[in-house]
């Protein structure tokens, strides 16, 4: 009963904080098989996510030491800030939809200034990013990659190695980033903060 209630709370929180989400699986692990408000590990698999106007194809989340204080009798419910390990997949379509959203207009403008071209979309192949110009042509002579360090991701011109920081957050640790044939996979770690 408590496990079902915890699962329902997690599902509802995900549906509240995401503009869109298809939840494939939620697994709650408690070492002593009892629920006392603490979840040792929470695993979430989801797809077709839109979070903060960012489109994500697939996501695997592992949350450790989650404390749920469920309130009854009109007392306030809250969740203490747990640590999350997140693996996400971004397809070409995800990135194009994200960059076409008004929320990310300044990022797109920065990229256009960096690559000296207006673009309508991107392509991912050969472990690189290619920009499709507004007139529909791709400059196959110039490709870009993504590089990461502890808290940031940069777009890098493969010819002259110039960089543009496209993500920087001291609260998020970038663990891994790699290109597959048609998508990008990113692994991050962060404390989850609920406001």
PLM region spans:
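N-terminal beta-strand/beta-hairpin edge segment
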Residues: 14-93, 191-192
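Short N-terminal helix-initiation segments at or just after the protein's N-terminus
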Residues: 5-7, 26-31, 124, 128
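Mature, soluble, non-transmembrane domains
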Residues: 88-182, 189-194
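Hydrophobic, proline/glycine-rich low-complexity stretches
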Residues: 1-19
